[in-house]
């Protein structure tokens, strides 16, 4: 069965697809991880937010992440967040496929992620390095990470812990 890689600007998402993306995120983060937090944070529909997902032929979303463009201090950077995969679909390289697509879009810009600590090694395999101390958000340990590209300056660690990936 072919799992299609999809990408969309927030403004171009149809209601049914947005529903499927949010449904998967709630299933993983709120229900599975027993983490009651406000999943709808207002960033999914921002003009510069992109969504990536893997979709079964029947339209079922298998995995998703969002890529947000940020302009802190006038510098364009990116942040990957809300990375998740259906429980039954884990271990098949879906997260790798999504990360590779998002990283390709980021190009030479600095990219941040606040990774759940137990996933830090997986993100390290994609070029991310720890950029600050571990912190706990919604009862789950996280570590701020950055992916440095050619010519990108290291960020100050004081501003890295602003958004969780909720992996």
Enumerate the language-model features and the residues they cover.
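Conserved GNAT acetyl-CoA-binding A-motif
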Residues: 104-117
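Short acidic/glycine-enriched loop/turn segments that link adjacent beta-strands
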Residues: 46, 74, 137-141
């Amino acid at each position: 069965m072919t799992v299609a890689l999809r990408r969309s600007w927030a403004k171009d998402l149809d209601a049914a697809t947005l529903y499927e993306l949010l449904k998967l995120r709630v299933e993983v983060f709120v229900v599975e991880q027993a983490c009651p937090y406000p999943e709808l944070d207002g960033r999914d529909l921002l003009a510069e937010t992109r969504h990536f997902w893997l979709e079964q032929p029947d339209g079922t979303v298998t995995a998703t992440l969002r890529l947000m463009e940020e302009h802190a201090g006038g510098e364009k950077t990116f942040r990957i967040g809300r990375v998740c995969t259906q429980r039954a679909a884990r271990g098949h390289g879906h997260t790798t496929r999504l990360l590779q697509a998002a990283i390709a879009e980021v190009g030479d810009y600095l990219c941040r992620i606040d990774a759940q600590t137990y996933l830090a090694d997986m993100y390290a395999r994609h070029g991310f390095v720890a950029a600050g101390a571990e912190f706990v958000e919604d009862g789950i340990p996280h570590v701020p990470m950055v992916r440095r590209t050619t010519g990108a300056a290291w960020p100050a660690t004081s501003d890295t812990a602003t958004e969780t990936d909720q992996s």
